[in-house]
Amino acid sequence: DLVRSRGLGDVYKRQVSDRGLRNAGAREVWTKLVLSVKTFFTKMPAKQVLIAFLFMLFYRMPEGLLAKVSSLFLIDSGSNGGLGLSPQEYGFVQGTVGIIGLTLGGILGGMAAGRDGLKKWLWPMVCAITLPDLVYVYLSYAMPDSFIIINVCVFIEQFGYGFGFTAYMLYLIYYSQGEYKTSHYALCTALMALSMMLPGLVAGYLQELVGYLWFFIIVVILCIITFLVAAFVDIDPEFGKKEHEERQ
């Protein structure tokens, strides 16, 4: 009985010890979570944090609207104001030509920023992600029958988006620097998802209200917001350069 009591006592002590370790581990995880969220909002002066959040939420707002409607525009019938592409034509335009343009734009954007830094290429990238949206104004106005013209227009828009999106991704990395960088980058990507979701909620309603042509005109006008939020972000001139990153 004595041996059994001691054995039960040892088991109880181990259970209490294990529970204490688990509780301590949970407290440590919770503490780090709170600190990572707190430092995410306080890692810069309040004004710069606000500007950073506005940049992350609104830099891609026009693209958030365009992305939801452009695909529908390509396949919708001419009687509804669309280009009336067949499924095969649409697959080639978006799945081949568009992807090639997007990939090439992203590669060249990364090469440019790696050579000269994000700050130097910010404005060219802002122009690249906004001005090519004009091709959809042209397409919805001219309604071209030429499949080649449609492909060229989609390529231009996707290439510009790939090039301009580089600035956005690099800024997320820039803001995430410092302690808890992995957690901060995860929070930045949450804002990135929100930046596309919010415009998408109203894109369809707006298109039905004004039609394709005026919808794309509104998208181009809203590109002013992208220029505004980009004008106020503060970026280290050395950030993004390959040599600077290697030293880090």
Label the predicted regions.
Residues P87-Q88, G178-C188:
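Loop-to-transmembrane helix entry/capping segments in MFS-fold secondary transporters
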Residues Y59, K68-Y90:
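Short amphipathic helix-loop junctions that connect adjacent transmembrane helices
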Residues D18-I51:
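Juxtamembrane intracellular "pre-TM" segments in multi-pass secondary transporters
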Residues S5-R6, Y205-C223:
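A membrane-interface helix-boundary motif in multi-pass transporters
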Residues L104-K119, Q207-E208:
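Helix-to-loop junctions at the C-terminal end of transmembrane segments
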Residues K13-V16, I217-R247:
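Multi-pass alpha-helical transporter architecture, strongest
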Residues K120-Y168:
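C-terminal transmembrane helical hairpin of 12-TM major facilitator-type secondary transporters
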Residues D1-Y12:
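Single conserved hydrophobic/aromatic residue that forms the stacking wall/gate
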